[in-house]
Amino acid sequence: MRLGYNEKLVLLKLAELKNATVEELIEKTNLDQVAVMRALLTLQSQGLAKVHEERRRMIKLTETGKRYIEIGLPEIRALKILKEKGKVTLNDLKDVLSDEELKAIVGVLRKEGWAEVSKTKEGLTLKLSEKGKKAEKRAIDIALEVLSKGEVSVEEIEKIISVKELKRRKIAEEEEKVIRNVEITDKGLELVEKGIELKREVSILTPELIVTGKWREVEFKPFNIKAPVKKIYPGKKQPYRVFLDKIRRRLIEMGFIEMTVDSLIETQFWNFDALFQPQNHPAREWTDTYQLKYPEKGYLPDENLVSKVKEAHERGLAGSRGWGYVWSPERAMLLMPRAHATALSARELAKGIEIPGKYFTIQRVFRPDVLDRTHLIEFNQIDGFVASEDLTFRHLLGILKRFAIEIAGAKKVKFFPDYYPFTEPSVQLSAYHPELGWVEFGGAGIFREEMTEALGIKVPVIAWGIGIDRLAMFKLGVDDIRYLFSYDLKWLRESKLIW
């Protein structure tokens, strides 16, 4: 068996004392409490010493009690003045007693028989009695002397005075303490008798040890790489933020161009009208979207684009008959927090794009909803589109499946037919979560020609809008979407880094 310097030192002192408290070992070895306790744990694990724990009720001085040790009990201070003057009023004692002490002093002096109390013109007057002249040490005075040296067991102090009396006068307080007594075992004594060489241990070989040759006189402490150590939590990025950054980088590596915007506010023109969504569509009502109270309206883009969108709604484009109603520019000017990131896709298409071209954006969107494990009223959406001559619906399904499996880590994926005013055909993407079952990720489709032609695009455009928060739930292994924005330090510290 191998013992370190501290273990050897404690064992040698135990051999001298046979048994001792931890406090006594601290005093004898000049080690601190932590070092002694660690040494004892090692000695006990190797059967060289035994540690016995005993719970005791202990009494120790309060701050008031410590003050009385320094300046004396109130009655002792009052008695000293009485012995000097023979007779005093309560006012004469104000310099040596506090107001609270003055209230109690008459009763204490009368109880001890140290003073005679009478009423005079000057107020209550105290006169030194014969018993006061010969006053001796009382139990409380002896108890204070004992406690001044340190805490004492209740049993020990009860031999002198009632603990209840000390607590009543707020001189002392009671606490339960664990007393550790240590004894050396026969195995420990046997090892000491064989002889223990006490050498200083070092953990670092310094230049000084080499130059002076002192390395020969010391013992090098081996490193235990399996020993438990305190966990260190270095600075770390928020897990969901890392997930978003990884997706952004992955898409850029795949050749996608990122669409950016500075504002969270859109006109209804970009949020709905440019997407060929009619102005009487129920999704445009207050139950499905937020509206801005002030300012209420924004500005429409250039007249040519507005007239094309108007024509698409009223009479149709690309062989369509449109929606057959009178389109209102006033309605299109209304401002709202962005309801979906597809509004940015419409803006990008109207600006002009590379063909073939791939575009994406990750944006915050807002929709009225009931907060639960899978729904938020403010969330992130990844929106994107690909424009090219030869694109088909199967290309879109392939991209969506890749998103679900490679990015979210989903094992099962399903597609369902769906409807959106601005795509045809349309599809819903869902994936299976082990805790929540089938979870909808988002919608997708091929942009309708009525929309793309109005925006100046003549080729097929496949597009998608996916709730990226739900993708993150799969990847980060959480079953409540609200947890992605949690302040829970345990989760933030222990969440694993992702791909």
Swiss-Prot record:
Binds 2 magnesium ions per tetramer. This is Phenylalanine--tRNA ligase alpha subunit. The keyword Aminoacyl-tRNA synthetase applies. The lineage of its organism: Archaea, Methanobacteriati, Methanobacteriota, Thermococci, Thermococcales. SUPFAM superfamilies: Class II aaRS and biotin synthetases, Winged helix' DNA-binding domain. Keywords: Aminoacyl-tRNA synthetase, ATP-binding, Cytoplasm, Ligase, Magnesium, Metal-binding, Nucleotide-binding, Protein biosynthesis. Mg(2+) binds at E424. Its main location: cytoplasm.
